[in-house]
Amino acid sequence: YKYERFGYYYKQHSAKLYPNSYNLDLSSTSPANHPYKFNFPFTHVEFTTKANTLDPQSMRAIKTAIDIGNPILIINDGMQFSAGVNLNIVLDFALEGEWKKIEEFIINFQKTCKIMKYCGQPVISAPSGLAIGGGFEVVCQSNFTVSHTNVVLGLVETLVGLIPAGG
């Protein structure tokens, strides 16, 4: 691929560059930019925490999007799609001895993933950059995945002594 004045171009077997008609600029899906660009209604979900980590608010956002009833597009324009669950939340609960809260947090994440999988409406994820840990589990629960060429997917919880628990 090569970026020129009006977008990305790709090279076929010949030396000529052809416009990439399948290019989707991630920023074009933002509700603030062209909210009616597409011919069908959809709900745009974007994680906006540091490194797009997942926390209870992220789970609530996904559940709210499902309740709206439109197809769901989970997309983030940045270096990370999602670096997974915010382990600082889990660490804080562990240091305080709040084991029940850790269990509730994990169950909430598991329920959210299952609701995503079986909600009956299309859930589309478009990961780019890192989609690791819980972020990868969100991608796995989607009905459709449109991955960027630079995406890095994986379950990396074992590197910090945990097991994947989202779904």
PLM features: what roles do these ranges have?
Residues 102, 110, 114-167:
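Conserved catalytic cores of soluble enzyme domains
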Residues 40-46, 59-100, 107-126, 148-152:
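A structural preference for short, pocket-lining loop segments at secondary-structure junctions
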Residues 1-39:
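NAD(P)-dependent Rossmann-like dehydrogenase/reductase catalytic/cofactor-binding core
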Residues 11-21, 62-65, 143-150:
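Short charge-dense sequence patches
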Residues 23-32, 70-78, 99-103, 157-161:
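Phosphate-binding glycine-rich loops and adjacent basic patches that engage nucleotide phosphates
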Residues 49:
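Rossmann-like NAD(P)-binding element
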